Amino acid sequence: MKFFASCAKGLEYLLADELLALGASRATATISGVNVEGELRDAQRAVLWSRLASRVLWPLTEFDCPDEDALYAGVAELPWDAHLSVGHTLSVDAHVSGTAITHARYAAQRIKDAVVDTMRRQGLERPSVDVENPDLRLNLSLRKGRATISVDLGGGPLHRRGWRMAQNEAPLKENLAAAVLMRGGWPRAYADGGGLLDPMCGSGTLLIEGALMAADVAPGLQRYGSDVPSRWRGFDRDGWQQLVGEARERDRVGRAALKQVIHGSDMDPHAIRAAKENAQVAGVAEAIWFGVREVGELQTPPQATGVVVCNPPYDERLAADAALYRRLGDTLQRVAPQWRASLLCGNAELAYATGLRAGKKYQLFNGAIECALIVCDPIAVPRRTPLAAPTALSEGAQMVANRLRKNLQKFKKWRAREGIECFRAYDADLPEYSAAIDVYQQADGDRRIFLHVQEYAAPATIPEADVRRRLNELLAAAREVFEVPAERVALKSRERGKGGSKYGRFEQRNEIVHVREHGALLRVNLFDYLDTGLFLDHRPLRGTMAQQCRGRRFLNLFCYTGVASVEAAVAGAASTTSVDLSATYLQWCADNLALNGLAGSKHKLVQADALAWLEAERAHFDVIFCDPPTFSNSARAEDFDIQREHVRLLRAAVARLAPGGVLYFSNNFRRFKLDEEGVAEFAQCEEISPRTIDPDFERHARIHRAWRLTA
C-alpha cells in the first residue's frame, strides 16, 4: 500500500531516509513530501516516531476530478459509515492547484457536503464539523484534475510535540529543529560523548528537541498521551497501543541514561524563562543548562567536541543584521573551534556574514520564510599548510607551465579591466596536451583558487600510456603555476572502452563553491558533474543582456542553472522568468537567486518543456535569452533537435517579444545551419557571434554561435 508523508520544503530526502529507517518498504522524495510504500502499521509508526514529517496521509480513494460535481460524486461513492462513527466530528483540509476548482475552502466544503449527504441517505446521524480537534480529519489533494482523499492519521500537524507551553517571538517549528540537528550530526556526536550548544536558544526548541532525540523519546508520545491520533474507524488501535508500549519502554531507558551535555543561552531573560518552562514540561529540564548571556560572552564548553546549533533572528520584526551574524561566527571560532556547527540563517547573505566556511549548505523553509542552513565541520578551518616544495617538472610539464604563464600575462589587463574572476586559462594550446583548464576564484572566505580540468578525447592512434603521462604532466604544471593542492583540482578525464572514449565517474563531494560574475554571486559544483553550473563562454552575452534588462522583463528559456536570470536581476530587471524541464536545474537557479537576496514573486521559475510552454504562453517580455541543447530526449517531453526545430522555436519566442523587444539565440552545435529564409518570415536576424566571444575563448571561437532577433 502507498501513503504520503508531507514535510517542509527542503526536508524531503532526510524524511525519506528516516521513514526507511522506521521500516517503510520504499520511500521516494518528491516536492514537499515523500511517497511511501508500506503497511498501515508503518504509517502509524511514522505518526509516532517521525521527527521530520508534517503529516502522514493514508489514501482512501483517488479519481479524476475535472470540476466540483466530479469532486462531490467521487467522495459520495465512499462508504462513509465504514470510516466515520455516528456522533463523531469531521474536518477537511484541502490543497488545490492546476484545476478548475481554485478555492481550497470551497473544495473542502463540497467534500463535507458529500460526506453529510451520503450518511443522511444511509439513515445515519449528520456528522458535525470540528476544525480544531475532529475525530476524523480528511485531506484533499487536487492537482491537475486528479483528486486524492486521505485520512490524516496524525489528526493534525506533527510538529506539535505537546511540550511547548511558552515561546518567544518567531518560534522555530520542532520538525525543522530536528532537521537542523540531524544535518549537524547531533545523534552521532551524542553517541561519541559530544555536547550540544545553542548561544541564541530563544524558547529552547533546538535544545529540547536535541535532548528528546538523545533520550530516544518518540515525538508522538507526549502529543497524544493515552489517546489515539485519529478516531477513523480503520485505525488499528491494538497496533497503535503496541507501538506506544514499545516507545514508552525506550523512553524510560533513554531518559535514565540522558547525559548532561546540553547548554543554552540567550540575552533575553524572558526567552530563557520560557525555555526552562518548556524543558520542564518536556521532562528534560535536568539535562539542559540555561543561562542569560550575550553571544560575545559565551564560554568554552566543557566537552572537547560537539555540535553548535543556532537559529539566529532574521525576520523583519527582529531586525537582524550582518553584524550579529559576524559576532556569532567570531565567537564560535574562539570558544568551540573543533566543534561542528549547524546554523539556520535567514538567507545566504547572512550565512556568509558569519565568516564561517560552510562545508555544506541547504535551502530550508521555516513556514513561509526561506532560510539557509550551513554546516561547518569543524567551525575553525585549520590553517593552510604550505604547499610542499615543488618537484622538478618534466620537460613536457614545463612546456605547459610556460604556456599557462604566457596566457595569464596575456589576460592580465583584460581581467583587471572587466573584473573577471572565472576564466579559461588553457584550451589545448599545445595539441599534444589536449585539455581545457578553467579557473574559478572563490568569491567568499579566503578567495581560494579552484581548477576545473576537462580532458579532450585523444586520437585512438596515441598509446594509452602516453595519454596518461601527458595528462599527469598537464596537472603537475597547472598545480605549480596556480599554487593549488590536488584537492582543489577537479578532473574530468576520459576512459577508453567499447564505443570509444568517454568520461569516467566523477567525484561525489557535494562541495559548493561561490564565485562571482558581473556582480552576481553564483553556486558552482566543480566535482560532481561534467558541467559546473556556469558556462564561461557565454559570459559576454550574459553581460550584454544584463545591461539591457534594467527595469525590463527578462525571459530565460532552457535556463539551466539560471545564471543569466540572476545577472539580469542583479542588474535591475523588473522581473525574470526562467523555464527549464529539469527540477534539479530550477532548484539550482532558485539557490542562485536566493544567494543574491533575490528570491520572490518577481522571479518566476517554470518547470516545463520550453517549446510547449512558449506556444501556450501569452505574456510578453522585453529581453529573451534562448540557449537550447543540441538534442534532448526527455521522457517528459517530445524529442528535441535544434537543427530540426529551431525555426518553430524562434517563431514561438519572437511571438512573446514586447514592442521594441530583443531575442538572443545561441547554441553550441558545431554543424548548425540557420534557416535564414524561414526566420526572415517573422523576424530580423543578425549574427553576433564574434561579439560574444571573450579573449579566453578566442582560440576556439566556434564554441558557440549567437544571433540577435527583433520582430
From Swiss-Prot:
Keyword Signal among record annotations: no
Localisation: Cytoplasm
EC number: 2.1.1.173, 2.1.1.264
Family matches, as InterPro entries: 23SrRNA_methyltr_KL, DNA_methylase_N6_adenine_CS, RlmKL-like_Mtase, RlmKL-like_Mtase_CS, RlmL_1st, SAM-dep_methyl-trfase, SAM-dependent_MTases_sf, THUMP_dom
Pfam families: Methyltrans_SAM, RlmL_1st, THUMP, UPF0020
Record's function text: Specifically methylates the guanine in position 2445 (m2G2445) and the guanine in position 2069 (m7G2069) of 23S rRNA.
Lineage: Bacteria, Pseudomonadati, Pseudomonadota, Gammaproteobacteria, Lysobacterales
Disulfide bonds: none
Residues covered by the THUMP domain: 42-153
Species whose genome carries this gene: Xanthomonas axonopodis pv. citri (strain 306)
Keywords: Cytoplasm, Methyltransferase, RNA-binding, rRNA processing, S-adenosyl-L-methionine, Transferase
PANTHER family noted in UniProt: RIBOSOMAL RNA LARGE SUBUNIT METHYLTRANSFERASE K/L, RIBOSOMAL RNA LARGE SUBUNIT METHYLTRANSFERASE K_L
Major site of localization recorded for this protein: cytoplasm
HAMAP family xref list: 23SrRNA_methyltr_KL
Alphabetized NCBIfam families for the sequence: PRK11783.1
UniProt keyword Plastid, yes or no: no
Any one Gene Ontology molecular-function term assigned to this protein's record: RNA binding
UniProt-recorded name of the protein: Ribosomal RNA large subunit methyltransferase K/L
GO (cellular component) term, any one: cytoplasm
Record field: catalytic activity: guanosine(2445) in 23S rRNA + S-adenosyl-L-methionine = N(2)-methylguanosine(2445) in 23S rRNA + S-adenosyl-L-homocysteine + H(+); guanosine(2069) in 23S rRNA + S-adenosyl-L-methionine = N(2)-methylguanosine(2069) in 23S rRNA + S-adenosyl-L-homocysteine + H(+)
Family according to the record: Belongs to the methyltransferase superfamily. RlmKL family.
